[in-house]
């Protein structure tokens, strides 16, 4: 660590959207954002779970628009920067400008781990707006460390000043993380930061985040009570407690985060965010974590096991954006019974 302060990036109000089908109220957003700000996290990501303009038939409709959520959070923070997520092909540069006007100052431009080339326009435009611009390589387990580093280099070339290893499936272990960060560090400029976005499907979210920091990672994503897709993200309060034990500088108030997790976030969960049969299957099969609720709906509709659907999706190497294929897979399984 060399005494540097970690950048703590909260994702409760974006990845956490998946856990409650994108149904946060504006008052929920205000309360959670204020609590996070009071606890001194560095940034608070706010958007539909699938990023700007994710509210749709395919991904699920949100209770409010991205801009309403962003404005609600921006109104109550004094310290933290408001971040947002943009997936090229779902959100556009016009949506990004609107998010900036609503108060977002950080954007993470997210692509599948082998498709960084679709992010050029969005990264360049974010830099023109003066935003803190991050490249976000989703499903990072699905390509080799060397290929991931080449994709990271593309994003750096477009103007991203930080590149994330994103374990969207919660499928990686500590060795996988170390290999990817070493590859990125060898390829990127020394001044380009790196970040880690973990999911907890194999209960390794915190361990993988620690491994990333040990390899020189600058920014850590986490969420209160692990609120996120699948078994959730690295739980923020747990990561901070572990970082404290390691003597790392993080600048946040552990007890305030613990209170916010239990008092504000956990009561909102209509399905427990935890490692269980279905979420473990996600991590084991390497499936996009936000498929969970969609798979459970399809399983109930067609009289199937959600685990069987998830395992088949993993075999077919489905990636984020292919939510519409969940019903196809379910119908195939039913017809083959």
Swiss-Prot record:
The keyword Membrane does not apply. Keywords: Aromatic hydrocarbons catabolism, Lyase, Manganese, Metal-binding. Substrate binds at residues 14-15, 168, 197, 288. It catalyses: (S)-4-hydroxy-2-oxopentanoate = acetaldehyde + pyruvate. The record marks 14 as: Transition state stabilizer. Optimum pH is 6.25-6.75. It comes from the Bacteria. GO terms for molecular function: 2-isopropylmalate synthase activity; 4-hydroxy-2-oxovalerate aldolase activity; manganese ion binding. One of its GO terms (biological process) is 3-phenylpropionate catabolic process. It is an enzyme of class 4 (lyase). Its EC number is 4.1.3.39. The active site is at residue 18. Pathway: Aromatic compound metabolism; 3-phenylpropanoate degradation. Mn(2+) binds at residues 15, 197, 199. InterPro entries: 2-IPM_HCS-like (IPR050073), 4OH_2_O-val_aldolase (IPR017629), Aldolase_TIM (IPR013785), DmpG_comm (IPR012425), DRE_TIM_HOA (IPR035685), PYR_CT (IPR000891). It holds the Pfam family HMGL-like. Residues 6-258 form the Pyruvate carboxyltransferase domain. Belongs to the 4-hydroxy-2-oxovalerate aldolase family. Presumably stereoselective for the 4S-enantiomer of 4-hydroxy-2-ketovalerate. Interacts with MhpF. Catalyzes the retro-aldol cleavage of 4-hydroxy-2-oxopentanoate to pyruvate and acetaldehyde. Is involved in the meta-cleavage pathway for the degradation of 3-phenylpropanoate. This is 4-hydroxy-2-oxovalerate aldolase. It comes from Escherichia coli (strain K12).
């Amino acid at each position: 660590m060399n005494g540097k302060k970690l950048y703590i990036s909260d994702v409760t109000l974006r990845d956490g959207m998946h856990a409650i089908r994108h149904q946060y109220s504006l008052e929920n957003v205000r309360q959670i954002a204020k609590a996070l700000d009071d606890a001194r996290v560095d940034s608070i990501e706010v958007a539909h779970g699938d990023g700007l303009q994710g509210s749709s038939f395919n991904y699920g409709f949100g209770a409010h628009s991205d801009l309403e959520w962003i404005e609600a959070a921006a109104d109550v923070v004094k310290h933290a920067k408001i971040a947002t997520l943009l997936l090229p092909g779902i959100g556009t540069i016009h949506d990004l400008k609107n998010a900036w006007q609503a108060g977002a100052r950080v954007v993470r431009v997210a692509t599948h781990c082998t498709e960084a080339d679709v992010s050029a326009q969005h990264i360049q435009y974010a830099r023109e707006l003066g935003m803190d611009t991050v490249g976000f390589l989703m499903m990072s387990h699905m390509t080799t460390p060397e290929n991931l580093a080449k994709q990271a280099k593309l994003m750096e070339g477009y103007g991203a000043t930080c590149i994330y290893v994103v374990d969207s499936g919660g499928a990686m272990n500590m060795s996988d993380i170390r290999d990817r960060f070493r590859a990125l560090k060898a390829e990127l400029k020394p001044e380009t930061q790196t970040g880690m976005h973990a999911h907890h499907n194999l209960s390794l979210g915190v361990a993988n985040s620690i491994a990333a920091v040990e390899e020189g990672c600058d920014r850590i994503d986490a969420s209160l009570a692990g609120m996120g897709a699948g078994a959730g993200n690295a739980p923020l309060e747990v990561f901070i407690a572990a970082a404290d034990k390691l003597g790392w500088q993080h600048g946040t108030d552990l007890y305030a985060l613990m209170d916010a997790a239990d008092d504000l976030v956990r009561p909102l969960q209509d399905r427990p965010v935890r490692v269980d049969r279905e979420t473990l299957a996600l991590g084991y099969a390497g499936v996009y974590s936000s498929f969970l609720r969609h798979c459970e709906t399809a399983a109930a509709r067609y009289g199937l096991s959600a685990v069987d659907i998830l395992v088949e999706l993993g075999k077919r190497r489905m990636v984020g954006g292919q939510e519409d294929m969940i019903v196809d897979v379910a119908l195939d399984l039913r017809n083959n019974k």
